[in-house]
Curated annotation (Swiss-Prot):
Name of the protein: Cysteine desulfurase IscS
Annotated [2Fe-2S] cluster binding sites: C328
Organism classification: Bacteria, Pseudomonadati, Pseudomonadota, Gammaproteobacteria, Vibrionales
Function statement: Master enzyme that delivers sulfur to a number of partners involved in Fe-S cluster assembly, tRNA modification or cofactor biosynthesis. Catalyzes the removal of elemental sulfur atoms from cysteine to produce alanine. Functions as a sulfur delivery protein for Fe-S cluster synthesis onto IscU, an Fe-S scaffold assembly protein, as well as other S acceptor proteins.
Keywords: 2Fe-2S, Cytoplasm, Iron, Iron-sulfur, Metal-binding, Pyridoxal phosphate, Transferase
Organism superkingdom: Bacteria
Cofactor(s) the protein requires to work: pyridoxal 5'-phosphate
Listed pathway(s): Cofactor biosynthesis; iron-sulfur cluster biosynthesis
GO biological process, one term: [2Fe-2S] cluster assembly
Compartments, record wording: Cytoplasm
Enzyme Commission number(s): 2.8.1.7
Subunit: Homodimer. Forms a heterotetramer with IscU, interacts with other sulfur acceptors.
Organism: Vibrio cholerae serotype O1 (strain ATCC 39315 / El Tor Inaba N16961)
Homology family: Belongs to the class-V pyridoxal-phosphate-dependent aminotransferase family. NifS/IscS subfamily.
Amino acid sequence: MKLPIYLDYSATCPVDPRVAEKMVQYMTMDGTFGNPASRSHRYGWQAEEAVDTAREQIAALLNADPREIVFTSGATESDNLAIKGVAHFYNKQGKHIITSKTEHKAVLDTMRQLEREGFEVTYLDPESNGLVDLAKLEAAMRDDTILVSIMHVNNEIGVVQDIAAIGELCRSRKVVFHVDAAQSAGKVAIDVQEMKVDLISLSAHKAYGPKGIGALYVRRKPRIRLEAQMHGGGHERGFRSGTLPTHQIVGMGEAFRIAKEELQQDYDHALKLRNRLLDGIKDMEAVTINGDLDQRVPHNLNVSFAFVEGESLLMALKDLAVSSGSACTSASLEPSYVLRALGLNDELAHSSIRFSFGRFTTEAEIDYAIELIRVAVDKLRAMSPLWDMYKDGVDLNTVEWAHH
């Protein structure tokens, strides 16, 4: 067993060996290394053909038209292009946007930027299970609302939003609907026709593809217009200029092809591992599972261990590669803003760990993880005076702490 055990698949996945093997063929003199935009010779034609194939593979996973796929450097850029692109193009129709408080920073920070530019953003509070209430979303809509941006699967707590219902609502109100699907593509089925989504952000490295490549799905019927954020040679139908990285695009295409073929297999494997981990820790005292347990992907388990400091638990679990919150924010000592939005207090939010598993995780690794978690939590609680007070029946919320 390789230590530390990797249980941080929501941060990134290892590249599937089949994907890596394919990518290598598009880099060197022996392979297809040409620029897809070179129209005058075979090197360019072959590269363009490889890009077209990848575009088809990505579109197939979404039940989309290949012409609706725009390549970007990743989901962060896709979020920026979608949100700023819509805001700047449709600003004559209105300047109001709706999103939720539990979105990824790539969405929230983009919204903050638009607020500085004079747009008005409504941030919806999720329910305590992490899901957005459709009635609250509808109530927030106004005549000048131009965009709704709600993620499909949350990166910290793994809950799955009812995208089809939100899409129906947005379509009936003629509001553009953007979805960040970085955490759901390849994990759950996505059908853009059924879901009535206008824009979808995609990432390759969350689906066993390479880092540094992503895509934005841009609906053609009804046509969605965007203002480009990256200017230059007019690549990607003018949406996103820049030479296309053939090897990365081929990697993303292959990763999405495999994801489509093995979707059910991967899902069942993750579910088995998640249930195994849950069964191994659910009888522990003062343990909370964060987020709805039914409407969530099985690849994620976010757990709060009360009376244990999250940072010290991470240190104690040095043989497990896990995180507290998302990789993008886990470097900060602030409690997770996602868990705070669910109504968890600072202490509980601070004591949470995200376990995320995937294609290459084994049952033996989960069993080893359970053992480590139980020992570490018991050891840390044994050192905690708060744990002693809790065991003595003291309600810690009513204690008046003296400030010396």
